[in-house]
């Protein structure tokens, strides 16, 4: 009885538009890793790619949004630029944490790579030390 009632409630919510039809196909995955150390300006350093820790149930799942976070050992050096990239495109990150739809439409099972770049030439003192970085990928 409860199962039948639950099914009727869900069908009703779908039919009046309170729940989108693809609401049950949504999901998210989280991945994190230790960061990088960078001591030279003008050189882009890619961190180890992050990917879904388990195979996704849907092969055609697409990214809706991504939350990111990276932690630095000390203050960010002048000229620091950080991007989050798939194999086909990148989005610049504004600050150490946030939420973006900049990679929406990409395959949800794709690898994501943090790329760190410090504009200019010469050594960075103290070196940039990224303690860790994390992504939360929301997909549908």
From Swiss-Prot:
Keyword Protein biosynthesis: no
InterPro entries to which the protein is assigned, alphabetical: FlhE
GO biological process per UniProt: bacterial-type flagellum organization
Signal peptide: 1-25
Keyword set, alphabetical order: Bacterial flagellum biogenesis, Signal
Pfam families in UniProt: FlhE
Function: Not essential for flagellar formation and function.
The protein's name: Flagellar protein FlhE
Source organism (scientific name): Yersinia enterocolitica
Name of the coding gene: flhE
């Amino acid at each position: 009885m409860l199962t039948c009632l639950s099914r009727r409630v869900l069908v009703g919510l779908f039919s009046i538009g309170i729940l989108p039809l693809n609401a049950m196909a949504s999901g998210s995955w989280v991945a994190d890793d230790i960061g990088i150390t960078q001591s030279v300006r003008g050189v882009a350093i890619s961190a180890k790619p992050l990917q879904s820790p388990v195979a996704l149930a849907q092969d055609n799942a697409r990214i809706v949004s991504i939350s990111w976070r990276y932690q630095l050992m000390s203050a960010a050096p002048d000229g620091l630029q950080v991007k989050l990239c798939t194999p086909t495109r990148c989005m610049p990150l504004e600050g150490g944490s946030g939420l973006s739809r900049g990679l929406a439409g990409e395959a949800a099972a794709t690898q994501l790579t943090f790329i760190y770049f410090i504009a200019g030439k010469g050594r960075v003192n103290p070196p940039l030390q990224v303690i860790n970085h994390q992504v939360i990928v929301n997909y549908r």
